[in-house]
From Swiss-Prot:
The modification Phosphothreonine is found at T313, T403. Phosphorylated by CDK1. May regulate its subcellular location. Its main location: nucleus. This is Cell division cycle-associated protein 2. Regulator of chromosome structure during mitosis required for condensin-depleted chromosomes to retain their compact architecture through anaphase. Acts by mediating the recruitment of phopsphatase PP1-gamma subunit (PPP1CC) to chromatin at anaphase and into the following interphase. At anaphase onset, its association with chromatin targets a pool of PPP1CC to dephosphorylate substrates. There is a cross-link at K753 (Glycyl lysine isopeptide (Lys-Gly) (interchain with G-Cter in SUMO2)). Residues 522-543, 790-803, 993-1011 have a biased composition (Basic and acidic residues). It comes from Bos taurus.
């Protein structure tokens, strides 16, 4: 009742600051948020509740107002202010929060109800009915008293009639407990922990025999705190420890020793005394009650320890110091199992020294064998058993791994234990086996701690006679030799080291173990080696791929940022994917045409061999190695019309050098594509073959170059020719852009070269033409023309037959011109011809070539000059297209993407040319290098007239090389400009399909050239 009044005061004190609080909201200790406007509404209910709380509330009849809850507590009476505090207060409810008075009283009410239920069972207890113990639990005194009362009330009341002395002692404890526990400031137990522990023990106390070791340890702490008081209070503390439960430190030992525990505390005391574990604690406590305990021993525990009855009093008289030490140890160290065993050992040592009861020591040893062995079993999680527990020495580190037990024998540890004679066991049964671990000696630490489990199990399993029989001289000698090194108090004990040595001496297991080790270690090494090898292989397989992927990503990022990409960067493209059809880049009609091209190439080669014989064989290797061939060889081949053709080529190269440099990459790619397409067009091939025949005759007259100028300029000077065709063009027209004059001849020569290089065009006419060209004189003439024709070969893949003869000469010229790579398709007139070329060719050649062209076809020359001028005047094309070169077999080495700029239609001629640009049609040789794209590997596409930078549409079409070579990257003569400007950065879009008229015109022009 006083507690309620005491609580009302702090509530008022907490509420008092509210009156002094200004207009600012305050958070009270009870958790309520109070604002100035809520003061008047909330103060009165709080005062009212404080008065009502003086008496315990009956929650069956209590109202909301009594608890201080009103509608105002849920509604915020704001004065127009919208502060964040007010907003939060609207969303908050203080009902049910921890620390509120109504919540606290509700908790107390529940506690009282529980206490009332238990009151019927504990009516005799003086303090059980008082609610003060439950209400004012914040003080240490009430916490301790409530704990003990809750734990002992039921048990003590049941046994009250049997032991009046104990009830009196309990009353003494309860009277003195308050004062005694006030002095113990160390034991600051929380209310929750005390109640929860009391509940646990209240449930477990009736069946004390099934108490867990953890509960015993927890209770031991409580009992120790009580026992740690002055000697005057020891009796009360110890009696409570014994009376409360056998769960104190001794109770854990009772369970360990396997002694039967009855519900009565007296029986627990008797069993403890019989086991010699808690005799120390019971001595001080009982004092004059020794006789009573002896009587109880005789009554209760006759079956457990009959010898102990007469020995209880002397034990009590003798073990006062040991009991003190035991209590102190239990206070300092919580693990009671080992400490209790140590106390038992000390007690047994004292008994043995006084020679009072040897039989007791033997009985104690026998009783504790299995009990102490059970403890380490629970602690050890992993055990290796062969039908029974093995000694740790079987698995000892010093012994070899996988030490087998001999067939029919128990673990060696048993024989080692047998080294102990029966008198030794009686003299020091336990203390030798359970000493306090010495952490200084690592080996002894292991020896002292681990063998507990096995040692007792072995002692229990073996008979003394069998032990004596199994002993051998080697064992005793080894053990004696080992005992010399042991401290004198351990002389009678066989250590693990001695057992090890005795094993090694008495048994020949060492050799066997070594053999097993020798076998086991290689196996382990093999396994480890295998694992390492597998890991290394796995790392080799996986890690490089990741690295490659990362590198590829970096490269792709770098490429994507660059607009103008050099073909040299794409040299690694072949390694990434050698199969063009699997490329992620969509290929337009060329993909479908490539198989046809391959078949055509195969057809042309045998046809070429049949028609040309040896000459064909010479040309095929040239196709492959044109780039590698020396320019001097080509110059020798050119011999016939070297002057005329070289002049024209030089002029073309000079004029086209600027274009070739710019359009080098683009034209190479485009021309290679055009070559493939042109191969697919048999009609264009036939026209080209006719043109080549004409050009063959013209080459001899050195006028063919002029007519051939109309052939689309071959930008074979471009980067390294990946494809043999482009390489020949580079080599033959080393200045691949010289296409104007060279292309004029190239139109014919390119047809020949196209046949030579890849035989792209399957033309019987070409074969016939090649037969005509087979003569050396024609070859020489063609060689001079082939300087141009090499470029035209790049542009014209179809005109193979005539080009073969001229290709030999052209290939030589192309090698010579390789030195002058970077040539653009030069216009036949003025600026285009006068464009500076990196090559050292003289401008006089260009002039002479122009003259020749004008002599043969003045119209064609005009067209070429116009186209060249237009291409020079053109600015960089706005649009750019990427072109893939991988599908062309001639360009396999330099696969990749090239930016090509589609040139605007320059003039009627250029527009016609752009129209002629086929989307891979099979008409003419399929490649109109109208754009004068310099692809070292690509053959200049379309007719020789178109290949000429002038590329007049009609006259160019007349040339055999003009046979419509619709290339993906078809571009007008302006393309050389665009290529020079964008240079591999722009891609040309597909223009209109070839007109049939252009084919007719090409045939007509070829007829005119032949005439």
């Amino acid at each position: 009742m006083d507690t309620c009044s005491q609580e009302s005061e702090p509530l008022q004190t907490k509420e008092s600051p509210i009156n002094n609080a200004g207009k600012t909201p305050l958070v009270l200790g009870n958790g309520k948020l109070v604002t100035p406007h809520k003061q008047a509404a909330e103060m009165t209910p709080n005062c009212y509740t404080s008065e009502t709380f003086k008496s315990p509330l009956n929650f069956s009849t209590v109202t909301v107002e009594q608890l201080g809850i009103s509608p105002e507590s849920f509604v915020n009476n704001s004065s127009g202010k919208s502060s964040p505090y007010l907003k939060k207060s609207r969303r908050r409810s203080t009902v049910g929060l921890r620390g509120l008075p109504e919540t606290n009283h509700l908790i107390r009410f529940v506690a009282e109800q529980r206490s009332l239920k238990n009151a019927s069972l504990t009516q005799t207890s003086p303090f059980q009915g008082s609610p003060a113990l439950y209400r004012n639990v914040y003080s240490l005194r009430e916490q301790m008293s409530a704990f003990h009362l809750a734990f002992n009330s039921i048990k003590e009341n049941e046994k009250m009639t049997d032991c009046p002395e104990f009830s009196e002692a309990e009353g003494v404890f309860k009277t003195r407990g308050s004062t005694k526990k006030e002095s113990l400031g160390e034991c600051q137990l929380s209310e929750f922990s005390a109640q929860s522990s009391s509940k646990r023990r209240r449930l477990s106390s009736p069946s004390s025999s099934d108490v867990n070791l953890t509960d015993a340890v927890d209770l031991q702490a409580c009992g120790v705190n009580m026992a740690a008081c002055p000697s005057t209070d020891m009796k009360c503390a110890v009696e409570t420890c014994a009376g409360l439960s056998q769960k104190s430190s001794a109770s854990g030992l009772n369970l360990q020793c396997g002694c039967l525990m009855n519900e009565s505390p007296l029986l627990s005391e008797l069993t403890e005394a019989s086991s010699g574990i808690q005799d120390a604690a019971s001595v001080e406590e009982r004092g004059s009650n020794d006789a009573v305990s002896v009587d109880k021993c005789t009554e209760v525990s006759t079956d457990t320890a009959p010898e102990v009855r007469s020995l209880v009093t002397p034990l009590c008289q003798k073990d006062l110091p040991s009991s003190k030490t035991f209590v102190l140890r239990s206070v300092l160290k919580k693990p009671a199992v080992k400490l209790c065993v140590e106390s038992l050992q000390e007690h047994l040592d004292n008994l043995y020294n006084d020679e009072t009861c040897p039989s007791l020591t033997s009985s104690l040893a026998n009783s504790c064998k299995e009990q102490t062995a059970a403890l380490p079993n629970t602690k050890k999680r992993k055990r290796v058993t062969f039908g029974e527990d093995l000694s740790p020495e079987v698995l000892d580190e010093s012994l070899p791994a996988n030490t087998p037990l001999r067939k029919g024998q128990t673990p060696v540890r048993k024989k080692d234990l047998s080294s102990l004679s029966p008198p030794l066991l009686e003299q020091s049964p336990v203390p030798e086996w359970l000493p306090q671990p010495n952490f200084d000696d690592k080996e002894e630490n292991l020896e002292n701690i681990e063998p507990l489990q096995v040692s007792f199990a072995v002692l229990s399993s073996l008979n003394m006679s069998s032990i004596a029989e199994t002993l051998s001289g080697t064992d005793t000698s080894a053990s004696s030799s080992n005992h010399e090194n042991i401290a004198p108090f351990r002389v009678g004990r066989a250590t693990r080291t001695s057992d090890r040595r005795s094993k090694l001496i008495s048994f020949s297991q060492e050799s066997v173990c070594n053999l097993l080790n020798a076998e086991a270690q290689p196996c382990k090494e093999k396994k480890t080696n295998r694992r390492k090898s597998q890991e290394s292989k796995h790392a080799d397989k996986v890690l490089p791929r990741k690295n490659r992927v990362l590198k590829g990503c970096k490269k792709k990022k770098g490429k994507g940022k660059r607009k103008g990409v050099q073909k040299s960067l794409y040299g690694e493209r072949d390694l990434a994917s050698k199969k063009p059809l699997l490329s992620p880049i969509p290929e337009l009609p060329e993909v479908s045409e490539t198989p046809l091209v391959g078949s055509l190439v195969r057809r042309t080669y045998p046809d070429d061999f049949n028609s040309n014989g040896k000459f064909e064989e010479m040309m095929l290797p040239k196709r492959e190695n044109l780039l590698s061939q020396d320019p001097e060889d080509w110059q020798v081949i050119q011999g016939f019309n070297k002057d005329n053709a070289s002049e024209s080529c030089s002029s073309d190269m000079k004029s086209s050098s600027s274009f070739s440099n710019a359009t080098f990459e683009q034209d190479a790619n485009i021309n290679s594509i055009e070559m493939d397409e042109n191969e697919n067009i048999p009609k264009a091939i036939t026209l080209e073959s006719e043109n080549e025949r004409k050009t063959g005759t013209e080459c001899e007259n050195s006028h063919i170059s002029c007519t051939l100028v109309t052939v689309t300029p071959v930008v074979s000077d471009n980067p390294k020719p990946d494809f043999p065709l482009q390489s020949q063009e580079l080599s033959a027209a080393g200045q691949n852009v010289e296409n104007l004059f060279q292309i004029v001849k190239i139109s014919e020569d390119m047809n020949i070269k196209c046949e030579k290089q890849s035989g792209f065009s399957v033309i019987p006419e070409d074969k016939l033409q090649t037969e005509h060209l087979i003569p050396d004189s024609q070859k020489e003439c063609d060689c001079s023309e082939d300087v141009l024709t090499d470029q035209r070969k790049v542009s014209k893949s179809q005109g193979e037959d005539l080009g073969r003869n001229s290709a030999a000469s052209c290939s030589g010229v192309s090698d010579r011109e390789r030195k002058y790579r970077g040539h653009s398709v030069g216009g036949s007139d003025g600026p285009g011809l006068h464009l500076e070329r990196t090559n050292n060719l003289q401008t006089s050649y260009s002039m002479s070539s122009l003259v020749e062209i004008s002599l043969e076809n003045s119209e064609l020359c005009k067209d070429l000059s116009d186209s060249i001028e237009q291409s020079l005047q053109r600015t960089k094309s706005e649009t750019k297209v990427r072109r893939s070169l991988r599908l062309q077999k001639s360009l396999e080495r330099e696969g990749g993407l090239v930016w090509v700029s589609p040139p605007p239609p320059p003039a009627s001629c250029t527009s016609q040319r752009t129209k002629r640009r086929t989307v891979g049609t099979l008409d003419s040789r399929g490649f109109e290098p109208v754009s004068s794209r310099q692809d070292p590997c690509t053959l200049p596409s379309t007719s020789s007239e178109e290949n000429g930078e002038g590329f007049t549409a009609a006259p160019d079409a007349s040339l055999p090389g003009k046979r419509r070579r619709r290339s993906f990257c078809t571009s007008t003569l302006a393309n050389p400009k665009s290529t020079t400007q964008s240079r591999g950065c722009k891609r040309r879009s597909f223009l209109g399909q070839k007109r049939e008229n252009t084919l007719q015109e090409t045939s007509r022009e070829s007829d005119l050239s032949e005439n």
